[in-house]
Amino acid sequence: MSSADVITLPKLLSKVPEIFGNLPGLIKGSKMSKITDTNTPLGLGVAFEKATDSNPNGVAILYEDRELTYKQFNAWANRIADYLASIGLKKGDTVAVDVENRPELLATVLGCAKLGVCSALINTSQKGKVLTHSFNLVEPKAAIIGQELVEVIQEVRDDLDLKQNFFYFADQDTLADPGTAPEGFTNLATEIKDCSSENPASTHQTFLRDPLFYIYTS
């Protein structure tokens, strides 16, 4: 893929967002980066579940006035994974993600990772034809759009190859208040409320060379 870089676990180890703080399973990057066994389950989902088991009540997310423990954040990601699985997404699929840097973005990436679904992290500054190209390039099976990016997506909606499965996250604490999705979008925060918060078995079906997310370069 000429304009997207695949990020797998070894590359991720040096790129963990600061918002995750001290994630025990990933801090040991020097050890994990030496793993060569392609049959050993590992990945962001595996690492986060291990961190949750060892420190469930520790603070995983600090963002503005929001604070989430490992247990809370893991459960949130599990509900996202459960819902995406319920609509047919599976390992090897791609989801386009156009959300600014906030907890909803991280929960989405982690939820997708637990399914083996690759998150295509759309550059939030893109518009028009550039946005259309980036979006269509990865052939997503679904799209998760933040309220802050709905307008620019709507401007190119007719040019996008994806015609269904457009999901929405309000630009607020969606765990406290899911907000209301605009026409043409499904409110993901509402849909996941009754989904399972248990760790999915699919987490342990991701391996060393499975992609985690796409990032876009010029």
Task: Report the location of each language-model feature.
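Conserved AMP-binding/adenylate-forming core of the ANL superfamily
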Residues: 36-44, 57-102, 106-110, 127-135, ...
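Flexible, non-catalytic linker and terminal segments flanking ANL/adenylate-forming cores
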Residues: 1-41
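Structural core segment of the AMP-binding/adenylate-forming
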Residues: 2-15, 86-87, 114-191
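Residue-level signature of the cytosolic catalytic core of signaling kinases
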Residues: 40, 44, 145, 181-184, ...
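Conserved S/T- and glycine-rich ATP-binding loop of Class I adenylate-forming
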Residues: 95, 112, 143, 211, ...
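Short hydrophobic/charged patches on amphipathic alpha-helices used for structural packing
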Residues: 49, 81, 132-135, 203, ...
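Conserved pre-ATP/AMP-binding loop-to-beta segment of ANL
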Residues: 56, 167-170, 183, 193-216
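AMP-dependent adenylate-forming
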Residues: 20-30, 46-69, 175
